[in-house]
Amino acid sequence: MRRDRNHPSIILYSAGNEIHDTPNAELSKGILAGLIEVFHTNDPTRPVTQALFRPNASHDYNDGLADMLDVVGQNYRENEILAAHQQKPTRKIIGTENRSDRATWLALRDNAPYSGQFIWTGVDYLGESRAWPTVASASGFLDRTGRIKPAGYERQSWWSDAPMVSIERRVSRGEAQTHVQSRPQLLADWTPDNSAPHDENVEVYSNCKQVELFLNGKSLGAKEINPDASPRTWTVPFEPGILKAVGRNENQDGRAVTDELQTAGAPAEIVLSSDKTKIADNWDGVCEVTATVADANGVPVPGADHLISFAISGAGAIAAVDNADNTSHEPFQAAERHAYQGRCVAFVKAAAPDGNILLTATAPGLKSATIALAAGGAR
């Protein structure tokens, strides 16, 4: 607390997460009182909460424990915490761990006393997998390489004030599924396994009042925003080319936001990109280099799974590799990785205070690529 109490990101202190012994009311209230005193003594400016665990079962709302908190927090079960507020409207309430689905969002959006939610989780993580061979949780808005997933764009369409639009293709029945997960799989591509004439189901996430969908320049119709925050959907007869969504709002002076997906051809080359060009020579100085398998026109090939090898020279070293495949058992500390959904990443660290770094990516049958980086910069 003393280390972080002046940091502007601190808005609440938590006295515990999913404490299972709260049914012993007097014991748990005594412990909680001591914790609250420590928080208030060391920082009287910020409120204290606790992530209650099934408080209806442990009677936390009726035995006085919840009302010891400045802000009542509960994990999941949004209807319970809303009922607790209705029971006692002076309670300030917050979701301390919540799912990322639409029902959870609507509980927040449509109930002003519900001050906010902490979503589990922002990024996919190792562990808590559903079943072997999956070794990670796919519940994040971002995958393990930092790429925004469809759920992330969906949440952005609910939360952001900046106009946005994102197209996602729902994986057809029989098409390869790439994750073990409960929600239908969506991919940001227009390259299905089946290239013969058939229908594809498309979801568009957008906070714009109107979205119009185009396939190869032909309009497939415009749809208004749904009051229940559900995505706008189209059934699209597949043909190769460009699928484009255009989002519009009133009083935009004709300006619009767009997103498009393009059908990929055969894999032809590796394209390298990085999140920075200079890497500080310190413990957390790291650069993420993304290797994308593309066709001859530079269009990413989403189904490519080539084994990509990385070689580095100069003042750098490969710290780890990854591809965001939650069923992959490949080692992270290596210099090669299979592409997953057409891409993988290498994490590069500086091996000297200054100097040039060259990273090359190769794979059988693909044109190789090299990216120039440098050690140095802010420390």
Write out the residue ranges for each language-model feature:
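Short, hydrophobic beta-strand segments
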Residues: T233-F238, F332-A352
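Short aromatic-acidic-glycine turn motif
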Residues: P267-L272, F310-T327, R379
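Solvent-exposed serine/threonine-rich low-complexity stretches and specific carbohydrate-binding patches
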Residues: K218-P227, A320-E336
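Active-site groove signature of glycoside hydrolases
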Residues: M1-E26
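Short, solvent-exposed loop/turn segments enriched in Ser/Thr/Gly
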Residues: W283-V289, G355
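Short beta-strand elements
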Residues: V257-A266, L366-R379
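Substrate-binding clefts and catalytic carboxylate motifs of secreted carbohydrate-active enzymes
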Residues: I11-S14, L32-P55, D63-V71, Y76, ...
